[in-house]
Amino acid sequence: MELVVGRVAKSHGIKGELVVEVRTDEPEDRFAVGSVLRGRKPRESTLKSYTVEAARDHSGRLLLRLEGVSDRGDADALRGTLFVIDSSELEPSDDPDEFYDHELEGLKVVLTDGTEVGSVIEVLHSAAGELLSIRRTGETSGELLIPFVAAIVTSVSIADGVVMIEPPEGLLDPDFGDKSNSDNSNSDND
């Protein structure tokens, strides 16, 4: 299975540097000088190899210089390129409570009483922590966002293909937080 470890967001400067959105826990290894990256444009299947010539942090962003990319035009042509690895290249985790995103995607989500909620379609990473994006059973669109925290996610079994949750009241309510349904209208005060 192909996993994205970075995406070229844009060019930086006039010497061909690239701003890369990092999607790996090990950027210092994946993007080290001399590393060979495999990249492709979104929705394309042809992979091209790129050798890292230089890598540096700049204001919290990763800047890369790749061999053969020497000016802004070359760099702009790579905008949107996804750097990928094969999941078989990943080391298995020794921590039973640590998972790769691709291991969680597709798992069935059930309540502690056994009620099926849906399945994990994506793991989102935010400054506040990880969220599981859940597609409800029987629905073809829309999503529920569930914080991936021990207080809500009580267990994960990759072997059984199940994420067990015990959400607080209202978290699974589709109208949760929708102010248009509140009873705070002043129509009686005419």
Curated annotation (Swiss-Prot):
It comes from the Bacteria. GO terms for cellular component: cytoplasm; ribosome. It holds the Pfam family PRC. One of its GO terms (molecular function) is ribosome binding. Coiled coil: none annotated. Its main location: cytoplasm. Residues 169-190 are annotated as: Disordered. Residues 95-171 form the PRC barrel domain. The PRC barrel domain binds ribosomal protein uS19. Binds ribosomal protein uS19. This is Ribosome maturation factor RimM. It comes from Rhodococcus erythropolis (strain PR4 / NBRC 100887). The gene is rimM.
